[in-house]
């Protein structure tokens, strides 16, 4: 829902699909049966997916912070609060990148709509030329990938620590068992409740960034199709030349004779 969105973009404070310029351009493309309609709609759908996923991640981290208030272990609580703060910073960074992307989309739509008023449907042919979204989309994709990899590395470190901790515990227990003449324990216990708590924020971040990356790649694919379609369309100058070439033979034909003797 729109009320849940806490971030804004440089062109609007509303979700991208509800922006007036975006809605107007989508309606215009559909009304004129433009081949660009489907790909532009997919691009907007992918950006909406990014908005929604960031909104979910913000809610998840807020819920985790509430749970931490009930935690009794002060050292663990402080560590998890620090983790949440770091991940909130990562999300804020992605919100900023998304904000810049949305601003460019809105600005591009505004230019296309203005150009349409001057040149008509020809303005709809070069959609990708007005949008200039590739650098902004790549920034979102790369940022999401970097944060996702950082979360993976953090979880691997946690698993390694927990494994070493339980392995050390197993050796200590086996020493006691040996002294009592009992069989040693062969396997260490798996990570327990603490490991689950510590990894939870990283899991949420990894899921969020994975979805962000996937949506950015979908948007880039849609943009690439728009660019390819624009390359294959004849330019205005080429269209004028083709039209002139069709009219040229008619100009060169001799005018019909009006001589009485020729009838």
Where does each model-flagged region fall?
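Gram-negative host-targeted secretion-system effectors, predominantly Type III and Type IV
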Residues: 1-261
